Amino acid sequence: MGTYPAFSGSLQLPEQRLHGTSNLHPAGGYRIELQVQDATFDKYPAKQHAQRVAAKLKKEKGLIFLMGQKAALLEDSDQETRFRQRRYFFYMSGVNEADCDLTYDIQSDKLTLYVPNFDLRREIWMGPTLGPEEALKRFDIDEAKYQSFLEGDIKQWASCSGHGSTIYILHGSQKPTGDFPNVLMDSETLKPAMNACRVVKDEHEIELMRHANRVSSAAHIAVLQGIRKMTNEAQIEGSFLNTCVSLGAHNQAYGIIAASGANAATLHYSKNNEPLKGRQFVCLDAGAEWDCYASDVTRTFPTAARWPGTEAEQIYALVQNMQESCILRIKEGVRYLDLHYLAHDILIHGFLAIGIFKAGRAEEIKKSGASSLFFPHGLGHHIGLEVHDVSPDSLFAQDNDRTTDSWLFSSTYLSPCTASSPTLKSGMVVTVEPGIYFSQIALDNAKSEQLKHIDMDVVKRYMAVGGVRIEDDILVTKDGFENLTLAPKGQAMLDYIQQGNGSCNI
């Protein structure tokens, strides 16, 4: 059992969050109230995860060994690096503490955690470290021991298991310490099996991701409520971090992107230090982490409670249409790459309507790759213990004889937005994050077959928009989806900017 800052208060959500079939825009908007208070959470289901991995391995015997992240010092310094637990280790332990290892004996179904040996000096300076007795109370394990027992326990297991027994490890560099001459070290089999398990989330994992999204959505709302008084991108980043930390989320799932104006056309902009004056839009891509689980949320908004111009409003509406059209089609069995193609189709028809693309056949424009100049990334990716979470391709990818539209596809796209990815499965969590970007460097390096479809005189009117991206985290269900992300969009977003005091209580 653990004590964490927990969700509390009232929450008004769009109906689609629960059912995935209704209006994406609740008439009353969104209301999130979060506060820090003590609450008891169930144990992370580490033992169930170990059993799932063993079943995926399809082995009756063997020992799984996973090495946790070690505490380390910065180079030429006595200061420790920021600790980040190895995600595969966390998946089978639920332990977010340094210097731990674990074993899982497949045959006996025994999960053992090894914690750091008692160190009096460290206890005095840094406080109590995790001991065996506490570990047994807090975590879903069968046994807890000090690290000093690990080598002897593995040797005893090897002796009982016989010559040629196998220890399954993630990497050759993560072998258990010691000499085990009659044991095979298999570093090829475990990772694909764990990936196949990690990509489909259980209810405990989903609830952690719901809470990460609650915190992130509250932080996005706090930015909206304060944006009219902000003058620099750094203040946006600071506001977001302040809300997250105040609500108990001390880690971000990735580096915050607070990009205003033309900076929003840089997909992974990170400087976050330019003035907002004269900029039409801010693209804020930021997501908190909760108990090692990520959220990934992007909102694009003006610095005032109104659209900065016709062009900005048109592009925002087009991206919102791209996103919502794709989200509404999500359910088990859908091929995600088809949603990526749908987003491009909507972009192309939208650009034809506003004149960015010259009159012509949409299919010809599509084949030229012209739309990829403005939407150069994949529609989304898996999310979980990593913001760009693992892919299941290696174990249950399916043959797909459908032609890949190479003009809309890049080898840099992440699963499930790849040709080899399996169809969506209930329990997967994916992002849906279409965007439209007016990048001068992309246009300057465009191919002639792309440029012939683009009216550059019209494009000039839209360059000041910079970039618009909207991103939500979507849980796939049997019959539809659940949108885990609660931050407002569109008119509801403008209303929060106008209110400036709102109802996101911290």
Curated annotation (Swiss-Prot):
<dbReference type="Pfam" id="PF05195">
    <property type="entry name" value="AMP_N"/>
</dbReference>
<keyword id="KW-0645">Protease</keyword>
<protein>
    <recommendedName>
        <fullName>Probable Xaa-Pro aminopeptidase PAAG_05466</fullName>
        <ecNumber>3.4.11.9</ecNumber>
    </recommendedName>
</protein>
<dbReference type="InterPro" id="IPR052433">
    <property type="entry name" value="X-Pro_dipept-like"/>
</dbReference>
<keyword id="KW-0479">Metal-binding</keyword>
<feature type="binding site">
    <location>
        <position position="285"/>
    </location>
    <ligand>
        <name>Mn(2+) 2</name>
    </ligand>
</feature>
<keyword id="KW-0378">Hydrolase</keyword>
<dbReference type="InterPro" id="IPR000994">
    <property type="entry name" value="Pept_M24"/>
</dbReference>
<keyword id="KW-0031">Aminopeptidase</keyword>
<dbReference type="GO" id="GO:0006508">
    <property type="term" value="P:proteolysis"/>
</dbReference>
<feature type="binding site">
    <location>
        <position position="471"/>
    </location>
    <ligand>
        <name>Mn(2+) 1</name>
    </ligand>
</feature>
<dbReference type="InterPro" id="IPR001131">
    <property type="entry name" value="Peptidase_M24B_aminopep-P_CS"/>
</dbReference>
<comment type="similarity">
    <text>Belongs to the peptidase M24B family.</text>
</comment>
<dbReference type="InterPro" id="IPR029149">
    <property type="entry name" value="Creatin/AminoP/Spt16_N"/>
</dbReference>
<feature type="binding site">
    <location>
        <position position="471"/>
    </location>
    <ligand>
        <name>Mn(2+) 2</name>
    </ligand>
</feature>
<dbReference type="GO" id="GO:0030145">
    <property type="term" value="F:manganese ion binding"/>
</dbReference>
<dbReference type="GO" id="GO:0070006">
    <property type="term" value="F:metalloaminopeptidase activity"/>
</dbReference>
<comment type="function">
    <text>Catalyzes the removal of a penultimate prolyl residue from the N-termini of peptides.</text>
</comment>
<keyword id="KW-0464">Manganese</keyword>
<dbReference type="InterPro" id="IPR036005">
    <property type="entry name" value="Creatinase/aminopeptidase-like"/>
</dbReference>
<dbReference type="Pfam" id="PF00557">
    <property type="entry name" value="Peptidase_M24"/>
</dbReference>
<feature type="binding site">
    <location>
        <position position="296"/>
    </location>
    <ligand>
        <name>Mn(2+) 1</name>
    </ligand>
</feature>
<dbReference type="InterPro" id="IPR007865">
    <property type="entry name" value="Aminopep_P_N"/>
</dbReference>
<feature type="binding site">
    <location>
        <position position="296"/>
    </location>
    <ligand>
        <name>Mn(2+) 2</name>
    </ligand>
</feature>
<keyword id="KW-0482">Metalloprotease</keyword>
<feature type="binding site">
    <location>
        <position position="433"/>
    </location>
    <ligand>
        <name>Mn(2+) 1</name>
    </ligand>
</feature>
